[in-house]
Amino acid sequence: MNKIPFEYGSIAENEYFIDRIEDRRDLKTFLGGGINVMLISPRRWGKSSLVKAAMEELKQEQKDVRVCYLDAFKIFSEEEFYNKFASAILQGVSSTMEKRWADIVKFIQSISPSLTINSDPVNAVEVNLNFKPLKESAEEILNLPEKIAKAKGIHVIVCIDEFQQLANLPDWKRLEGTMRSVWQGQHNTTYCLYGSKRHMMMDIFGTATDGYS
């Protein structure tokens, strides 16, 4: 049987990703220029593949860019979000395990982290964070990409897939308020937040006073 000449059900990369030239160009222009982006489209319409393709191109074009990817689809608690957020940041900005651990020690000072090594090469390192006062720890974690960007002289882009799923968390309002407060003050970090449920995404981003712009 001949192999099907396209990818389905997973992120299409390299020769499996074609076209969408204008979309890739726009994403690179906005995110590379420090403008936050929100994307909405149904599941399986290629948002994740588009973002990945555009960001991999941008990393080649702008050597100071580091891209961090987080999938929020299966996050079920505020603490889990912070753990996965920190893991995604460290994975995106540090090229080796030794550098990731050094970044943990240097940039996450109020938290006692432990390191979990997975066999999955895509998510090879996960960080488990032992929280002290949640408010202080949460703000430190959300500010992690900005602290690292300033210290290393880089531009960090954080891409969060299925962002609207976070609105289902029991403590969503607290999480949302903290994200808005912290992210508004960041100048070296840019966010690409994308999801498949239009009404939920519009509820999150639909007001002119939101803090994501």
Task: Tell where the protein language model's regions lie, with residue ranges.
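Residue-level signal for alpha-helix termini/capping positions
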Residues: 31-32, 59, 150, 184
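Short glycine-/polar-rich loops that comprise or flank the Walker A/P-loop
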Residues: 63-67, 187-189, 213
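Helix-loop-helix "sensor" segment of P-loop NTPases
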Residues: 203-213
